[in-house]
Amino acid sequence: NRIHQKLVMELSGTLREYIKSQHGSCEIYPAPFAVFLGENTPNYVEPDISVICDKNKLTDKGCNGAPDFVIEIVSPGSRKMDYSTKNALYSDFGVREYWIVDHAKERTTVYRYEEDAAPIIIPFSMPIAIGIYQNLSITIAELLE
């Protein structure tokens, strides 16, 4: 839907501008973009937004291995997949940080797997610090204005 697309565009743009301003080398790919999590597996996921910092993982087909940062924007049909199935996959295969942006609940659930911490639930009105980028925080409500 429109809000889903707006969030993908705004989040991708914010991340891209930050990476460029820091002369970073990470790359951002919005869906459709295939992420092959297991070696020699034909199965893949298509996160709404993938941030990949190891360019050796990038191929013409997508990304082989876990992105550093993944954002999923919940749509009515993806709720269980985003909160359960993909959460387990991303944790198991080495994604460093995973956000579930839930417009219906106006909150973002943040998983920082490398810190082995409990998820943090942040309302859209509050800034969210990005674990892999120490100096960047994003307030989802501001992206929707």
Segments (PLM) and residue ranges:
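Gly/Pro/Ser/Thr-rich low-complexity, intrinsically disordered segments predominantly at protein N-termini
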Residues: 1-145
